[in-house]
Structures are given as C-alpha cells and as structure tokens.
A protein has these predicted regions:
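Core catalytic alpha/beta fold that binds nucleotide/phospho-ligands
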Residues: 2-226
Length: 226
C-alpha cells in the first residue's frame, strides 16, 4: 500500500452563516478526509465542533449531541448519522477537526515550545528503536522529532479509539527526518495505517491518522467567528 499523501491546501474560508462550509461538506466522499483548523476558545468548549459537524449532518449545531466512547473518544449520539466519523484536538489557541466517512480518523496538534524533558519522556514511553533513532539526532533536532512522534502516536491511538494507556511503546513509527509512517503496531497490520503530517505552520506540529486506503486530505482554515 502506498504511503504517499495526496494533499490539497486551500485559502482561508469565510463561513458566512455556514454557506461556504456547507458547499465543502457536501463534497465529502468515501475517498476523502477533511481537516479544519480553527481558533480554540476554552469558554466555547465543544460548541464550534458541534457547529461544524452540524453542517456535515445538515442540522443545527445545537442539535448535535456527543457521547464519549469506551476510551473517551467523542462520538455522535444516536439517532444522528454515525457513518460520519470525526476527531478533534486542541493545543493553546489552535484546534483541528478531522471529518471522514467510512473510517475513524485520529488527529493531534501540539504547539511548539521548549521541552527539556523530551528525551527522558521518550526513554520512558517510546519503543526502543525510536529511542535509539532520537539519540542519533543532533540535540537541536531532538525536541522537534520527539513532538512529531508524540503527535503521530496520539493520532494513531485516537483513530483506534484508544488512549495513551494502550502503551506508546506498542507502536513503532518512522523517526524524522523520515516521512511519517507506522512501521509496527501490536496486534494489527501496520501497512493498513495511513499517517500524515499536516501543514499547520511553524508554531505547531500536527498529524492525522486512519486505518484503510489512502485518501485525499483537504485542509481548510475556518474563519474566526464561523
């Protein structure tokens, strides 16, 4: 299976009463995955998430009810169309929402900041071969590579519907500067997994993952106030 990523990046979208977003949502196919970037406001909690999902579902945002899955992954509550799968992540004032049909995406974003404990954390939680590869990097590159691995692992685990408690050492990933890729996953076929780094700018690192065939990933920025 090819691990090449088909990615189209679009200019900032205006969401005038959701009309533009509705046009985008209507085009979501089984071979696509939509990723939205928006400003995270703690006071609004899941309101923007529900509003965006409502556009895809064709219902008002306040009609979108979410429930937590077995391991805390948010899901659409019945009787909503649960064939629409989503995941979201936020860090600082940035948030990402992944939306798909026919697969369960996992997404994770982290803001870049000094992480003096990056290597100790890696040595405690990561796979032995990842640790060795990180140690082989220049010290100036280790923190960025650590964050790339961390967000990638989070994305895969979230796509599985699991959390960190599953064990970060139970999956092994390609270590930067190699492209993102699942090399081994305990209890599953690693070649069935897609893992891609998202173009979120120099202030963050983000990855999206799903199990299944390659999809076209479309990346959008939701206008503030949308």
């Amino acid at each position: 299976m090819s691990h090449a990523m088909a990615l189209r990046q679009h200019a900032r979208m205006q969401t005038n009463q959701g009309q533009d977003v509705a046009n985008i949502a209507a085009r979501l196919g089984q071979d696509q995955l939509h990723v939205w970037r928006l400003r995270y406001d703690r006071a609004r909690r899941r309101e923007p998430l529900c509003a965006l999902l409502g556009v895809y579902l064709g219902v008002p945002g306040d009609a979108v009810s979410l429930v937590d899955g077995e391991h805390g992954r948010p899901e659409l509550a019945e009787p909503l169309d649960r064939s629409l799968q989503f995941n979201w992540s936020h860090s600082g004032d940035a948030a990402l929402i992944a939306v798909a049909r026919g697969c369960a995406p996992g997404i994770d974003i982290e803001q870049l900041r000094p992480r003096p404990r990056a290597m100790p954390l890696a040595e405690r939680f990561f796979h032995a071969e990842e640790i060795a590869a990180l140690k082989a990097l220049d010290s100036s590159d280790q923190e960025q590579a650590f964050l790339q691995l961390w967000t990638s692992k989070e994305a895969v685990l979230k796509a599985m519907g699991r959390g960190i408690a599953f064990g970060l050492d139970r999956l092994r990933l390609a270590v930067p500067p190699a492209p993102s890729r699942v090399l081994w996953l305990d209890g599953d076929d690693a070649s069935m997994w897609q893992l891609h780094t998202l173009p979120v700018g120099k202030d963050c690192v983000a990855n999206v993952a799903w199990r299944g065939a390659t999809r076209m990933v479309e990346y959008w920025t939701l206008a503030e106030g949308g």
